[in-house]
Amino acid sequence: MSEQIVTPESSTPVVPNKETKINLLDLNRQQMREFFKNLGEKPFRADQVMKWMYHYCCDNFDEMTDINKVLRGKLKEVAEIRAPEVVEEQRSSDGTIKWAIAVGDQRVETVYIPEDDRATLCVSSQVGCALECKFCSTAQQGFNRNLRVSEIIGQVWRAAKIVGAAKVTGQRPITNVVMMGMGEPLLNLTNVVPAMEIMLDDFGFGLSKRRVTLSTSGVVPALDKLGDMIDVALAISLHAPNDTIRDEIVPINKKYNIETFLGAVRRYLEKSNANQGRVTIEYVMLDHVNDGTEHAHQLAELLKETPCKINLIPWNPFPGAPYGRSSNSRIDRFSKVLMSYGFTTIVRKTRGDDIDAACGQLAGDVIDRTKRTLRKRMQGEVIDIKAI
């Protein structure tokens, strides 16, 4: 397992340069104001441009009608607004949309999950992942690189552009963002934190801190740093009731065990208002691996000092994986044990699994029909060969 924590020291230049245009999607509001100051402009001009960028999803300076023509001309010489492009779109029968998004010569995946009262966007932070969780499709491709700020916030921008910008449609197209796509967000703090700042900024996407969630598998030093930098909702990928099982399925546990991880979680909760005093526990259900009633009792004892709600996640198969999905009856028994201890327990509804957009299935490449057929067979579903 390769692990390198990138700490938040912005390296993005904010000095205008005609030879190398600055992508304004790489800049948070503080950096935008510095950039405009270096252009000889007042700080409020940065705020105006940000509103056009994020409230209207505008990437054309000429369309920014409250910006004078001279400034628009200067901006075109030294800056651009360039979000990553969608190279393929897949739509699920349940309304979920998965976009394969080009980042340089590679791809990441972003998932849009609409519901009656909300619309959640699942965003990637890295190309691949270094943590090698055994049940996750992303981990099987290894780690390639961190995404830039523009490639992270650009996923939100691109999705909002497609489904309808807030000022264009009159309603918020994305109500929640979860950093639960490809990669471990805490291994890319340099870019993840400024991107989340833009999500929260009133001149950015203006989301409540309770509606931006970062999920981590347990990079403890970075989690301790996060609490001093930004306040967002926290979810943790626990997936096991003891170190023996977690060492096997979440290898970073060998470096930062459950006790150490939960200690860092409690420290974060002490600093955070976004979490309302409790963390979300993510627990993927693997058949006869971590889903027995004895495991549920162990989990309840383990979490008794950590205020939390628990999401039980039916595992989503992918070709070559050594696991099976827990039966509904085993998940139900597990859930009832946890509830008997007083834990708020939710069985997550699987969304987008017919397009490989469900939890643990994002792989970066556009999934081909052969892989999808193999996955369906693993689930015991009958495949109509004519539909493949």
Curated annotation (Swiss-Prot):
One of its GO terms (biological process) is rRNA base methylation. Residues 115-354 form the Radical SAM core domain. It is found in: Cytoplasm. S-adenosyl-L-methionine binds at residues 183-184, 215, 237-239, 316. [4Fe-4S] cluster binds at residues 129, 133, 136. It catalyses: adenosine(2503) in 23S rRNA + 2 reduced [2Fe-2S]-[ferredoxin] + 2 S-adenosyl-L-methionine = 2-methyladenosine(2503) in 23S rRNA + 5'-deoxyadenosine + L-methionine + 2 oxidized [2Fe-2S]-[ferredoxin] + S-adenosyl-L-homocysteine; adenosine(37) in tRNA + 2 reduced [2Fe-2S]-[ferredoxin] + 2 S-adenosyl-L-methionine = 2-methyladenosine(37) in tRNA + 5'-deoxyadenosine + L-methionine + 2 oxidized [2Fe-2S]-[ferredoxin] + S-adenosyl-L-homocysteine. Binds 1 [4Fe-4S] cluster. The cluster is coordinated with 3 cysteines and an exchangeable S-adenosyl-L-methionine. SUPFAM superfamilies: Radical SAM enzymes. InterPro entries: Aldolase_TIM, Methyltransferase_A, RlmN_N, RNA_MTrfase_RlmN, rRNA_lsu_MTrfase_RlmN/Cfr, rSAM. Its EC number is 2.1.1.192. GO terms for molecular function: 4 iron, 4 sulfur cluster binding; metal ion binding; rRNA (adenine(2503)-C2-)-methyltransferase activity; rRNA binding; tRNA (adenine(37)-C2)-methyltransferase activity; tRNA binding. Its main location: cytoplasm. Its cofactor is [4Fe-4S] cluster. Gene3D superfamilies: 1.10.150.530, Aldolase class I. The active site is at residues 109, 359. It comes from the Bacteria. Specifically methylates position 2 of adenine 2503 in 23S rRNA and position 2 of adenine 37 in tRNAs. m2A2503 modification seems to play a crucial role in the proofreading step occurring at the peptidyl transferase center and thus would serve to optimize ribosomal fidelity. Belongs to the radical SAM superfamily. RlmN family. Reaction proceeds by a ping-pong mechanism involving intermediate methylation of a conserved cysteine residue. NCBIfam families: PRK11194.1 (NF008396), rRNA_mod_RlmN (TIGR00048). PANTHER family: 23S RRNA METHYLTRANSFERASE, RADICAL SAM CORE DOMAIN-CONTAINING PROTEIN. This is Dual-specificity RNA methyltransferase RlmN. It comes from Salmonella typhimurium (strain LT2 / SGSC1412 / ATCC 700720). The gene is rlmN.
